[in-house]
């Protein structure tokens, strides 16, 4: 088992499929958009033909109106009957969480969620000043999660996490990174965006909006989808729409490269054209 990381549009999926066919491995995708059914073009997920050649886990698992977090990927991983797999995806956060582990969370009922929403940062600070000092007063997501733990366990989150330390899900596996120059990556992003439009991106987003009728869904806020929805509202021309998707994707890729650089110290980095040979020599 090993992982391939790299920014969006760097060629991870194609490389993983080539290696999986050579090694007789299967693939676990840690992609926050490919996990959804019905989002085929905006996610740039492998084609039906590619999915038929190599078994993929983490692709087409849930519908766009279903929620998921890292626990979903952990659940998928634990159900894989063997470990001859290549873990691949631009969302390095999920890989890091699985390598370092996450604490077992208490059961959070709708009543607890409602109770937590009624409280603010000042209340959170009064019940757990240590934990509150580490987050911004504007970080409503983490405040909400912290309060949910407090109300579910009657324990401050800092104490709860101390008593429930994270347990790694993945072993210490080899990590290979696709090293790619930003200018080259931007050109790859441009080509991929053109391909998306030629494949019917606008029709796909129109279908998603018509079926789910809720632009607040996390899936419909993804790059490539949210811009098309704005285009429907008359915010962009078609040309501006393409440019906006390219720019936003390039910004995402930059953040992913920074994350991978700072969070995965023990990795082998090489250009795409060299990495296949390096991986084969390391794995075999």
From Swiss-Prot:
It is an enzyme of class 2 (transferase). It holds the Pfam family IPPT. GO terms for molecular function: ATP binding; tRNA dimethylallyltransferase activity. GO terms for biological process: tRNA modification. SUPFAM superfamilies: P-loop containing nucleoside triphosphate hydrolases. Its cofactor is Mg(2+). InterPro entries: Dimethylallyltransferase, IPT, P-loop_NTPase. ATP binds at residues 6-13. It catalyses: adenosine(37) in tRNA + dimethylallyl diphosphate = N(6)-dimethylallyladenosine(37) in tRNA + diphosphate. Residues 31-34 are annotated as: Interaction with substrate tRNA. Disulfide bonds: none annotated. Its EC number is 2.5.1.75. Substrate binds at residues 8-13. Keywords: ATP-binding, Magnesium, Nucleotide-binding, Transferase, tRNA processing. The record marks 91 as: Interaction with substrate tRNA. NCBIfam families: miaA. Monomer. Belongs to the IPP transferase family. Catalyzes the transfer of a dimethylallyl group onto the adenine at position 37 in tRNAs that read codons beginning with uridine, leading to the formation of N6-(dimethylallyl)adenosine (i(6)A). HAMAP family: IPP_trans. This is tRNA dimethylallyltransferase. The lineage of its organism: Bacteria, Pseudomonadati, Campylobacterota, Epsilonproteobacteria, Nautiliales. The gene is miaA.
């Amino acid at each position: 088992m090993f992982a391939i990381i790299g920014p969006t549009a760097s060629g991870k999926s194609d490389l993983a499929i080539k290696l999986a066919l050579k090694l007789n491995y299967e693939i676990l995708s840690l992609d926050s958009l490919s996990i959804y059914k019905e989002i085929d073009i905006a996610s740039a997920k492998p084609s039906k033909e590619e999915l038929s050649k190599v078994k993929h886990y983490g692709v087409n698992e849930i519908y766009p109106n279903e929620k998921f977090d890292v626990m979903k990927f952990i659940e998928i991983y634990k159900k894989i009957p063997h470990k001859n797999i290549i873990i691949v995806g631009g969302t390095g956060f999920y890989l890091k969480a699985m390598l370092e582990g996450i604490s077992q969370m208490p059961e959070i009922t709708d009543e607890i969620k409602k109770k937590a929403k009624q409280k603010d940062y000042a209340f959170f600070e009064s019940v757990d000043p240590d934990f509150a000092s580490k987050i911004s007063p504007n970080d409503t997501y983490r405040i909400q999660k912290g309060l949910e733990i407090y109300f579910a366990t009657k324990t401050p989150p800092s104490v709860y996490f101390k008593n429930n330390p994270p347990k790694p899900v993945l072993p210490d596996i080899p990590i290979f990174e696709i090293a790619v120059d930003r200018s080259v990556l931007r050109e790859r992003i441009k080509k991929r965006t053109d391909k998306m439009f030629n494949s019917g991106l606008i029709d796909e987003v129109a279908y998603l909006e018509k079926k789910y009728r809720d632009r607040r869904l996390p899936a419909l806020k993804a790059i490539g989808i949210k811009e098309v929805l704005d285009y429907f509202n008359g915010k962009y021309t078609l040309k501006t729409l393409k440019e906006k998707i390219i720019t936003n994707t390039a910004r995402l890729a930059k953040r992913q490269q920074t994350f991978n650089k700072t969070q995965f110290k023990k990795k082998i980095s090489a250009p795409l054209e060299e990495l296949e040979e390096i991986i084969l020599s390391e794995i075999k």
